[in-house]
Amino acid sequence: MNHFLSADAIRTRFSQAMSAMYQQEVPQYGTLMTLVQRVNARCLAERPALKARLEAADELERLNLERHGAIRVGTAEELATLRQMFAVMGMEPVGYYDLSQAGVPVHSTAFRPVSDAALRRNPFRVFTSLLRLELIDDLQLREKAAAILAQRDIFTPRCRALIAQYQQQGGLGDADADAFVKEALETFRWHGVSTVDSETYQALSQQHRLIADVVCFPGCHINHLTPRTLDIDLVQSLMPEYGIDPKALIEGPPRREVPILLRQTSFKALEEPVRFQQGETGTHTARFGEIEQRGVALTPKGRALYDRLLAEAGTGADNQQHQQRLAEVFRDFPDNERSLREQQLAWFDYRLSEKGEAQPPRPGESLATLIDQGRIIADPVVYEDFLPVSAAGIFQSNLGDRAQARTAGNASRADFEAALGAPVQDEMQLYQARQQQSLVRCGIGDA
């Protein structure tokens, strides 16, 4: 009998190893982790009802686990191999994001666990972007970038062998899993030596700094890791006290009684020394630490309302003005769980209370009545995915405050999936299935 390690266990080992590596490479990220943990502890101490709810919904244990990282790759082969690598860790491609609409020349997906059980064990996810070389205006430069990318291999031979072994055997044993984590980590390690000369780097950087970040280095170095906080506004306000320079605006929706979707901020990317191929030295700015506060996942109806209000709000000159404007506009978005539920704006996970187990639902009883009677408890489903406008805002602000908008490309999910070698899953279908399955477990709704 084979004794294979579970994908969840391998994912946990990998996320812990990546966190340790990133704290060594970017010490300020370790400081950020300390700040977030202190803020979370304070929130839980001051809000016992929130703590009790997180415990009841099995959310508390996963709170202090890292929530996501982000990488960028240059070729279809790199993306397809990453899909196979992440499959070893139980992470599947979910969602398609076209960041070119916001002036960033990439399109993306999120590799993440999809089952409720896997998300509870470790919700680690990696936002993965593929460079769109066709958005480089200069044909000569585009061809040069493609040639540079064709010469590199971002995976070690041992990593490729272990992926193949996993595919043949259907799993990895303990020692092989450790070796896999060690080898996979090399793909995401920072290298201060560029694969190009300074002139090429500058030419690509002038097209877009992100293009230089993808093309000019030997691997797809992790460009940020992101812990989860319960109060992102407090973290943002405390960052300067910890010697951390925050980005100007918190991305996403405003502060609310019932948080929705995803709010994100970060510290500004570090300027790091680089040695180029002709021996020249310079600097590169790309890597940073991010913080996120996750709320309830929205239905298509809720998401349409969110997108409309966000567009109406625009962008404020500073964070205080921006948040005030958002708060004003988002008064039109219901801010209590009952309204979100009854207007079908958000997804919920339903479970029987002790009272409900003693007196199970009977045919014909409405969900609203069962909730009012305390026989069914409705927990908001945590949003597990990303927001393209927020992701683009984070990327732009950490590639320098100078805007580098390019001509937007047409969204091409088909091209992305062809490069990936597989379809991406629809996040809305996953949330809908989770809500429906929870209703079935309660004895209402059809399987």
Labelled PLM ranges:
Residues 1-447:
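Extended, well-ordered protein cores
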